[in-house]
Every structure is written in structure tokens, then in C-alpha cells.
Amino acid sequence: MLFKQAILVATTLTDLAVATPVVDVRRRTDPASSCSTGTLNCCNSSGTVEDKTIAGLLGILNIVVSDITALVGITCTPITVVGAGGTSCTSQTLCCDNNNFSGLITLGCIPININL
């Protein structure tokens, strides 16, 4: 199953030219109810770089991370207006640094306790 997902991601992103960025993201300390230093995102899942799925995606995209302890968001979409009609996040709401790789991977995230 994981292999199929990796192949799907690889074939979907064939036209995406990604340089090899080195990202230095340390543990964020924002309060769990605010997002003043990043963007508010609705992500399908999140985890650490030690997670095999996330490590595989980082490898496919040639994203090199150094000293990352914050969460990594997977398949995230920005939430632009909090409380607007129709805005909802049924997955995980995360506040992430502006290290977004086409919405597939977003680095430097912390969970946010917010009702949308």
C-alpha cells in the first residue's frame, strides 16, 4: 500500500522541478491556539521525519531536512479566513512555517486547537 502511494506521488509530481533545499526547522513554541508566525493549514495527516511514509516522501522530493523536531504536515491546504461560511477542516489543523512544497509536504508545523 505504501509503495503504491509513493509511486502515485512520484508520477503525479514528474513535472515539478524541485531543487534540493536544506531546511532547518526547530521546535516551534507558539501557543496552541494561535498562528502568528506561519500559515494556518488543514492537513490530511502529520508526523515526524522519523515516520517511514514521511521520510519516503521527503526522499522522493529530494528535500533534505536538518535538525527538524517540529511536525511535518501531509497534503495541506491553507485556511484563509477563520470562521467564514463554508470553511471547515475535518482533518488536522496545523500552524506551519512557510516551508510548503506544493501542498504535499509542509514543514515546521504545530497543532492548533481551533474549531472551524
Swiss-Prot record:
GO terms for molecular function: structural constituent of cell wall. It is found in: Secreted; Secreted, Cell wall. The keyword Secreted applies. InterPro entries: Hydrophobin. Glycans are attached at residues 44, 100. Coiled coil: none annotated. Keywords: Cell wall, Disulfide bond, Glycoprotein, Secreted, Signal. Residues 1-19 form the signal peptide. Disulfide bonds join 35-95, 42-89, 43-76, 96-109. GO terms for cellular component: extracellular region; fungal-type cell wall. Induction: Expression is increased by carbon source limitation. Self-assembles to form functional amyloid fibrils called rodlets. Self-assembly into fibrillar rodlets occurs spontaneously at hydrophobic:hydrophilic interfaces and the rodlets further associate laterally to form amphipathic monolayers. Aerial growth, conidiation, and dispersal of filamentous fungi in the environment rely upon a capability of their secreting small amphipathic proteins called hydrophobins (HPBs) with low sequence identity. Class I can self-assemble into an outermost layer of rodlet bundles on aerial cell surfaces, conferring cellular hydrophobicity that supports fungal growth, development and dispersal; whereas Class II form highly ordered films at water-air interfaces through intermolecular interactions but contribute nothing to the rodlet structure. Belongs to the fungal hydrophobin family. This is Class I hydrophobin 1.
